[in-house]
Amino acid sequence: VPDGELFSSPIIDSVNGHIKYTASVYQGKPFEFVRLEVKDGVVQDFDSSNNEALAEILDTDEGARRFGEFSFGLNPVIDQPMHDILFDEKIYGSNHLTLGHDYEVAPNGNTSGIHWDLVCIGADVYLDGEKIREGRHFITDDLKGLNPDSLLVD
């Protein structure tokens, strides 16, 4: 499995805004897209190509509507989905906010029966109100070293 993911857990009540994910599968249920509206770390509203299945997933337990992981995909040679999450979560210029259980190595207190890595490719990303990534490229001086031209060696 290739390297190329930088992850942590968001502060449990800090996620606000909306995100639209690319195609995904969860326990055999296909989704062409998933769009979530989030306030204070909790999914408030959603839309997807399979709303019935998404509602069932989100209603698994209280933690299923919260996020257990946030990650940037950094592998410069993976540039499109392969429909295998162990590769897709590493697509350069992607990020994922994972619904459900956190990771033990980066706990935020969220527990759930689910851990669903949903990948979003090419989104603008803001942290603490500052835009740090535009599309697939980091734009702040302290993060530009994570762009492909800095990672690939001839």
Located regions from the model:
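Metal/cofactor-centered catalytic core regions of large enzymes
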Residues: V1-D154
